[in-house]
Amino acid sequence: MKKFGNYILTAGLLLGMLAVPVQAEEVSESTVLKLREQPFLTAPDMAVMPKKFLYDSGIEIAYPEDGVKGIYLTENTAANPERVDELIGYLNSNDLNAMVIDIKNDHGHVTTDFNSDDAHIQKNTIPVISDINALMKRFEEEQVYPIARIVAFKDSLLAQEEPGMSFLNPDGSIWEYGNGELFINPFLKETWDYAVNVGIEAAKVGFKEVQFDYVRFPEVFSNDDNGLFYDMGEFADLDLTPTEKRVKAISDFVAYAREKLMPYGVEVSVDIFGYAATVSEASGIGQDFSAISNNVDVISSMIYPSHWGPGNFDLSAPDLYPYEV
């Protein structure tokens, strides 16, 4: 979790405008001491932005003092008040304090009615959670820290509706993952805005953290794109390799999401593959741990044993050795 201190801006501005000459006996001429590489005047960070400038959802839930420790709920579970109460009791009995809830699920449905102006949200909403405001009030009563899970680029629903926003096979059909799942294209700004707009709606009803999952290209790109056809949008003309373009697209999306969500006072988190933290970049899927970490508050690294291949950690089959992994 990133925490940021306050800065004395006046002194910083003064120093930033001065080039300070430093005299040394061995050097006969003045040397300019560079005090700072980056400009002092930048967009305000959420952590130092006065609260009065942040959107007020009306839901007051403090960030847990001892850190976030919680459980995951599907939209169907979250829609059941009796089950939610049972799970709140479970949290209270086990030193837990948070719930992650599917708000845009793995198929592509938005799971509650936000009355949003976004056309994709309107079209793809199935309001399984019929009263999101009542749920948020219940969380407020118990101080349960609510996290909205938003599946970003795995979206079979939108891919079927808008094939041009997905990846196409040479015969014009939509490329499918082995289990039939479809992805939308992270190169396209429209896919960014869809995920971010769902996040904004979640923040407005009271969620305190927006967690983006499937923030990546499909794994087919880990080897090659198998002759797929897809639009690179504004990344097409960049003087970068296809690998570099994928990494930039994912890193830029994360930065964009955090910027857009900043006025709503929420933490921004992402789920990434565990191995992405052990390599300089997972270039096939576009995940660069360092670049992503610069633009989020939280990273959930997926270290499941099944995500590691033969030979990782000197194990022939890591999935068979969960404790060693």
Where are these regions (language model features)?
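Active-site-proximal loop/short-helix segments
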Residues: 115, 156, 161-164, 208-243
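Aromatic-lined carbohydrate-binding/catalytic grooves of carbohydrate-active enzymes
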Residues: 94-129, 222-230
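Glycoside hydrolase catalytic-domain groove-lining segments
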Residues: 233, 237-325
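Sec-dependent signal peptide cleavage junction
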Residues: 18-29
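Active-site-adjacent "subsite" loops/lids of carbohydrate-active enzymes
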Residues: 59-78, 153-204
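The substrate-binding groove and active-site-proximal loops of carbohydrate-active enzymes
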Residues: 69-78, 116-129, 179-193, 239-248, ...
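Glycine-rich, aromatic-flanked loop segments that form ligand/cofactor-binding clefts
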Residues: 51-54, 98-100, 130-176, 209-214
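Catalytic domains of carbohydrate-active enzymes, especially glycoside hydrolases
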Residues: 84-109, 204-209, 298
